[in-house]
Amino acid sequence: MPRILYKYLDIVGAKCMIGNQNLQFTNASQLNDPFDCHPKLIDYSNVPNTKLQGWIPKEWWIEKEENNALNLRNDTWLCSLSKINDSLLMWSHYCYNHKGICIGLDIDKVLESVPPMFGTIYLEPLVLEVQYQDIIERPNAYHTTKDLFSYQWRTKAKEWEYEQEVRLVIPKPSPIYAAFTPQQAKLTKEIWDWREIRHYMLLKGECFESIY
């Protein structure tokens, strides 16, 4: 994995990131791909009899496992970066039709900047390179050597391979780093879905390596 990773942003997002010197984390349920981090990426249907103990209904067990994976998704925030800075599709999709900015970050210095207790389970984000594959072929949850938590966070369909994504993943980040985006702060909604809230990790100046 390269030391310099890139964040594609529109002008407003770039000004906020550079001006506030922070990195925005979004809830895993709020991403633009509805299959991203979804419990259905993993097959929980082949339940071993040892799990059911002769009396637990199979359907109940499957629902329990999928709900656990869904709760994991809802409790996880992540930041998407890229290994490349010259993807035309990325400039089009994430930089407001090529009118935005791509910021290069030194990932080693980013991890050195993690504020105290940013996460309540892990003290700092996990760095995961996204794996692109046929998501129709789901791993059996009970007969695999894969780390299922990691698999759920890092697996995407092959159609997204052009992004060359690396993710910073933080399960259950501390609420002291939570905030609305500037756009959200202007809204007058009476009820907010807590998953819409962003979390912001403060960065030191030396984290910013380049701007395109």
Where are these regions (language model features)?
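Partner-binding and oligomerization surfaces adjacent to conserved cores of proteins
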Residues: 1-212
